[in-house]
Amino acid sequence: MRIQQSALLLLLLAVTSQGDAESNWNDKIKVFTVATEPTDGYTRYIRSARVYDIEVTTLGLGEEWKGGDMQKPGGGFKLNLLREAIAPYKNEPETIILFTDSYDVIITTTLDEIFEKFKESGAKILFSAEKYCWPDKSLANDYPEVEGKASRFLNSGAFIGYAPQVFALLVDPIEDTADDQLYFTKIFLDETKRAKLGLKLDVQSRLFQNLHGAKNDVKLKVDLESNQGVLQNVDFMTTPSIIHGNGLSKVDLNAYGNYLARTFNGVCLLCQENLLDLEETNLPVISLALMVTQPVPFFDQFLEGIESLNYPKEKLHLLIYSNVAFHDDDIKSFVNKHAKEYATAKFALSTDELDERQGRQLALDKARLHQSDYIFFVDADAHIDDGEVLRELLRLNKQFVAPIFSKHKELWSNFWGALSEGGYYARSHDYVDIVKRELIGMFNVPHVTSIYLVKKTAFDAISFKHKEFDPDMAMCESLRNAGIFMYASNLRIFGHLVNADDFNTTVTRPDFYTLFSNEIDWTEKYIHPNYSLQLNESNKIQQPCPDVYWFQIVSDAFCDDLVAIMEAHNGWSDGSNNDNRLEGGYEAVPTRDIHMKQVGLERLYLKFLQMFVRPLQERAFTGYFHNPPRALMNFMVRYRPDEQPSLRPHHDSSTYTINIAMNRAGIDYQGGGCRFIRYNCSVTDTKKGWMLMHPGRLTHYHEGLLVTNGTRYIMISFIDP
C-alpha cells in the first residue's frame, strides 16, 4: 500500500513539475514583429495579440523602411532588426522566439496553445508553409516532397524556435534590401543546416496558416449566437493559431478578420473600442463633398438630407460637383440659399466640363487646401435619413468608414463583401446578412461607394485614376494597396440608396414616375404626412355628408407635379360626348380631362389605389374587400369658367369614387365643389391633397358646382365599376 502511495505521489510530483516547466516555457516565449508605421493592419495585429494577453515587441516603429518595395522581393531589413533584438537571448536554450509579420497577420489563440503546437512539431525552428515557391521558383524541385494537399514551401512571414537556434539562423549577414524569404529558403534547402538547426515546415497548417493559394483549403466557422469565428484548415482539420494574408490574399484575410480574435461576442466588440470623444468646442473640420455624377430622382430630398446633418456648418467646407445639367439649377439655388451658413461653399457644374475623376480630385484638393481633418463624400444617390450620421462615423475613429446604405427591398448596397479575380464585385458569405442587418457591426470590406468619411491621414493614398476602373473602384484599389482598411458600418440605419435606373429626365416631373423603383422616397414626397394616422381605428373619419368620407391622402408636391404633368401634356378633351379614348367612343357625362393612360401613369396610379386608397376604403366601408382595386377610369378634370365651369347631375359607374382636390379653393379658384343631391349636402371648402370618397352608383347622385373664377383641378377614379 505504501509503495502504491509513494508511486502515486511521485507521479503527481512529476505531473506538477512538468506543468510548471510548461508554464515556464510559456513565460519565456518572446514575440517579435517588425512595423515601421502603425498602419491599420498593424493596429489589427496588436489588437489580436492583446485580446489573448500576448505581449509583442515591435521593431522598427517610427523608423524608415529600408527593406525595399514590399510588393517585390526584399525584407532583409526585418532580419537585421530581429538579429539585434534577440542577441541577448542567444545563450538561453529555454527562451523561445516567435516572429511574425504584422500588417497582414492575425493571432487567434493564446501563447499556451501556440507553445503546445510548436512542441508537438518536434522542431527546433518551425516555419510557416505555403503553396507557392517564392521568390525563386526554380528552387521548387529542391524542396522535400509532401503528402496530398500539404503546403510544401517555406514562408518567412511567421516562425517560432528556440533562441539559440533562431540566432544561429540569422548569423549570416543579409543586405537590408535582400529577400528574407530567399535567405531562409536557402538555409532550409541545405540538408546539413536544416538538420543542425532542427528546421521544419508546418506543412499541415497546425500552427500557421498562409492564405495565398489556400482559399479552398480553409473555412471560416462562425458561432451563430456569439458571431465569434475560427478559421479551420479543412484538408487537415486543424485550427491554426496565426493567420497570414500573404501575397494576393489580403482581401481574404480582411474578410476572415471581421470574425477572428474576438471581434464579436454576441455584439460587435470592435465597434466599442478606441472611440473618438467629440468635444463640441473642438470639433474636426470637415470637407463636405457632394457628388452628382448621374441624373437621380428625388434630388430635392437628397439636399434636405444634407441640410439635416447635425454638425456645425461653420465647421463644414461645402463643395458640390455636378456633371449633370439636369441638376445644375437646383445646385445653384441650394448654394445661393445656404452659402453663408457654411465655412465655404462652392460648386462645379456641368458647364465646367470636369469628368467624375476630376470632380472627385477637385474635392480632395480642396480638402487639403482647407486643411480639413476629414472629407465626407456623399453621392446624390445616397439619401441621409438620420442627421447623426456624420457624428457617428467620426466616433468610430477610423481612417475610412462608411455607413451601409441599400436600395429599398433590394440587396443592392454601397459596399462589396468580396472581389472577383478581376477586381470586380463578388458576393461574400456574409453579404446578405449584413445588408439585411441580421448581422450588425463594422466590417472591413474591399469596396465602398456613394457615402464615406475619410481621415486626412489617408488623403495621400487616394488615387482616382485607373486604366479600367471607374473613380470609385480606383480609389478603393489605391486604399487597399496602401493598407488602409475600408470599414462599413450597419450599427444604425442612417439612410438608403435611391434607384436611378431608368430615371427618365425627358418627362415632366420625372420623380412622379418612380413609385415602383423608389417606393420610400415616392411615399415621403407624395403622400400626406398625416396619412398613416387615419389608419388608426381610434382616429375618427370626417364625414362632410352622409357616407361621404374625407381623407388627407396626398401632399402638395403630388398635386403640383401631377397638374404640371397634365398641363405639359395639354391633351385635354373637348368636353363633348364624343370620346375616342373610350370603348364605343361615347361619354354620357363628359368633362374636360386627361386620362392617366395618356401620360403613361395608368399602372402607377392603380398601384397608388392599392397601396394608399384601399386601406382607407376598408376603414370607411366596413366589410368591403377588393384587393387590388380595379379602375378603368382614372383622370384629371379641369374646370374653368370659359371652358367647362360645372358638371350636370349624374351617377358614377363605380362601386365607389374618389375625388382628390388638386389645388386650393378660394385661392386658385372661386366657386366649385360637389353637391350630393339626395342629401342636399355640398362640399365646397375642398382642401388641396384631401380626398372625398363616396359610393358611386345608386345612392350618391351628385353634380359639380359652378367655378366662377380661376382654374379648378380634381383627380377622379371610378373604382370597381
Swiss-Prot record:
<dbReference type="InterPro" id="IPR044861">
    <property type="entry name" value="IPNS-like_FE2OG_OXY"/>
</dbReference>
<protein>
    <recommendedName>
        <fullName>Procollagen-lysine,2-oxoglutarate 5-dioxygenase</fullName>
        <ecNumber>1.14.11.4</ecNumber>
    </recommendedName>
</protein>
<dbReference type="GO" id="GO:0048471">
    <property type="term" value="C:perinuclear region of cytoplasm"/>
</dbReference>
<dbReference type="InterPro" id="IPR029044">
    <property type="entry name" value="Nucleotide-diphossugar_trans"/>
</dbReference>
<keyword id="KW-0847">Vitamin C</keyword>
<feature type="binding site">
    <location>
        <position position="702"/>
    </location>
    <ligand>
        <name>Fe cation</name>
    </ligand>
</feature>
<feature type="glycosylation site" description="N-linked (GlcNAc...) asparagine">
    <location>
        <position position="536"/>
    </location>
</feature>
<dbReference type="GO" id="GO:0050211">
    <property type="term" value="F:procollagen galactosyltransferase activity"/>
</dbReference>
<dbReference type="GO" id="GO:0005506">
    <property type="term" value="F:iron ion binding"/>
</dbReference>
<dbReference type="Pfam" id="PF03171">
    <property type="entry name" value="2OG-FeII_Oxy"/>
</dbReference>
<dbReference type="Pfam" id="PF25342">
    <property type="entry name" value="GT_PLOD"/>
</dbReference>
<keyword id="KW-0964">Secreted</keyword>
<feature type="binding site">
    <location>
        <position position="650"/>
    </location>
    <ligand>
        <name>Fe cation</name>
    </ligand>
</feature>
<dbReference type="InterPro" id="IPR006620">
    <property type="entry name" value="Pro_4_hyd_alph"/>
</dbReference>
<keyword id="KW-0479">Metal-binding</keyword>
<keyword id="KW-0256">Endoplasmic reticulum</keyword>
<dbReference type="GO" id="GO:0008475">
    <property type="term" value="F:procollagen-lysine 5-dioxygenase activity"/>
</dbReference>
<dbReference type="GO" id="GO:0005615">
    <property type="term" value="C:extracellular space"/>
</dbReference>
<dbReference type="GO" id="GO:0031418">
    <property type="term" value="F:L-ascorbic acid binding"/>
</dbReference>
<keyword id="KW-0223">Dioxygenase</keyword>
<dbReference type="GO" id="GO:0033823">
    <property type="term" value="F:procollagen glucosyltransferase activity"/>
</dbReference>
<keyword id="KW-0408">Iron</keyword>
<dbReference type="GO" id="GO:0005783">
    <property type="term" value="C:endoplasmic reticulum"/>
</dbReference>
<dbReference type="GO" id="GO:0005794">
    <property type="term" value="C:Golgi apparatus"/>
</dbReference>
<dbReference type="GO" id="GO:0062023">
    <property type="term" value="C:collagen-containing extracellular matrix"/>
</dbReference>
<feature type="glycosylation site" description="N-linked (GlcNAc...) asparagine">
    <location>
        <position position="680"/>
    </location>
</feature>
<dbReference type="GO" id="GO:0006493">
    <property type="term" value="P:protein O-linked glycosylation"/>
</dbReference>
<feature type="glycosylation site" description="N-linked (GlcNAc...) asparagine">
    <location>
        <position position="709"/>
    </location>
</feature>
<feature type="domain" description="Fe2OG dioxygenase">
    <location>
        <begin position="627"/>
        <end position="721"/>
    </location>
</feature>
<keyword id="KW-0560">Oxidoreductase</keyword>
<keyword id="KW-0732">Signal</keyword>
<dbReference type="InterPro" id="IPR005123">
    <property type="entry name" value="Oxoglu/Fe-dep_dioxygenase_dom"/>
</dbReference>
<comment type="function">
    <text>Forms hydroxylysine residues in collagen type IV. Required for the secretion of collagen type IV (vkg) from haemocytes, fat body and follicle cells.</text>
</comment>
<feature type="binding site">
    <location>
        <position position="712"/>
    </location>
    <ligand>
        <name>2-oxoglutarate</name>
    </ligand>
</feature>
<feature type="signal peptide">
    <location>
        <begin position="1"/>
        <end position="21"/>
    </location>
</feature>
<dbReference type="InterPro" id="IPR050757">
    <property type="entry name" value="Collagen_mod_GT25"/>
</dbReference>
<feature type="glycosylation site" description="N-linked (GlcNAc...) asparagine">
    <location>
        <position position="530"/>
    </location>
</feature>
<dbReference type="GO" id="GO:0030199">
    <property type="term" value="P:collagen fibril organization"/>
</dbReference>
<keyword id="KW-0325">Glycoprotein</keyword>
<feature type="binding site">
    <location>
        <position position="652"/>
    </location>
    <ligand>
        <name>Fe cation</name>
    </ligand>
</feature>
<feature type="glycosylation site" description="N-linked (GlcNAc...) asparagine">
    <location>
        <position position="504"/>
    </location>
</feature>
